[in-house]
A protein has these predicted regions:
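Short, charged, amphipathic alpha-helices and their helix-cap/turn boundaries
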Residues: 1-13
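Asparagine-centered polar/low-complexity signal
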Residues: 2, 17, 71-73
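Domain-terminus/edge residues, biased toward the C-terminal soluble/receptor-binding domains
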Residues: 10, 24-27, 31-190
Length: 190
C-alpha cells in the first residue's frame, strides 16, 4: 500500500493497515489524500459504485427483509436539491471520522469537463459539507484549463537533466523559445 502511495507521488502519508483507522505511525496529508482520490476516480467502476446514492442488501437468515443503505455524503446525496450541502456537480466521495483526524470529507466533482477533488480534514459536523462545497465552487470559478502554447512564448522543460551534444543541462537551465526557427531547435541556456 505504501508502495502505491509512492507511485502516486504521495510524500506525507504512511499506512499501517488497509482500513485507514488509527495507527501509531499512520498519517495522511490533505494533498496526498487528493492524489489518492484522483487515482481512485480514474477507475470508472469505482466512480459508478461510489456515486450510488442507495444500495439494497438482499435478505439473509439474520435479516429476512433485507435493508437499504444510503450514502451519507451530503454534497452527492440529497432528497432536497435546495439543501445548503448539496452540490450537483459532486459525483462521488467519502466521509469519515477518526479521533485524530476529526470529520473528514473527500469529494470528486466534474463541471464543464473539468475534474476537481476537495479534501477536508478535522472538519466540524455538517460544516465540513459547507466547506467542501465552497472549495469546489472556488476551484471551478478560479481555475481554467488552457493550452500554454496559446498564451506563453517560453517554456521550461521540466525536472530532468537533458543531455545535448553541447553538454548536460539541468531543466532549470533551459527554455524552449518557439520564436526560433526549427533548424535552431529553439533550446537555449538561460
Amino acid at each position: 500500500m505504501n508502495e502505491k502511495l509512492a507511485e502516486l507521488g504521495c510524500q506525507e502519508s504512511h499506512f499501517e493497515n488497509p482500513s485507514g483507522l488509527n495507527g501509531d505511525n499512520q498519517y495522511v496529508s490533505a494533498y496526498d489524500m487528493a492524489l489518492i482520490a484522483q487515482a481512485a476516480y480514474d477507475n470508472e467502476t469505482l466512480v459508478e459504485i461510489s456515486s450510488a446514492t442507495t444500495h439494497r442488501i438482499a435478505p439473509t437468515t439474520q435479516n429476512p427483509d433485507g435493508f437499504t443503505i444510503r450514502g451519507e455524503h451530503r454534497l452527492c446525496v440529497t432528497e432536497d436539491p435546495s439543501s445548503p450541502y448539496y452540490y450537483p456537480e459532486a459525483i462521488a466521495g467519502k466521509t469519515g471520522y477518526l479521533i485524530k483526524a476529526g470529520n473528514t470529507l473527500v469529494t470528486y466533482a466534474v463541471k464543464d469537463n473539468r475534474r476537481l477533488v476537495s479534501v477536508i480534514l478535522k472538519g466540524q459536523p455538517r460544516q465540513y459539507f459547507v466547506d467542501g462545497k465552497a472549495l469546489l465552487e472556488f476551484g471551478f470559478r478560479s481555475f481554467q484549463h488552457y493550452t500554454v502554447a496559446d498564451y506563453e512564448s517560453r517554456y521550461v522543460t521540466g525536472n530532468e537533466t537533458i543531455n545535448l551534444d553541447k553538454g548536460s543541462f539541468q531543466a532549470s537551465d533551459l527554455m524552449i523559445d518557439p520564436d526560433k526557427s526549427e533548424g535552431q531547435a529553439g533550446l537555449r541556456k538561460t
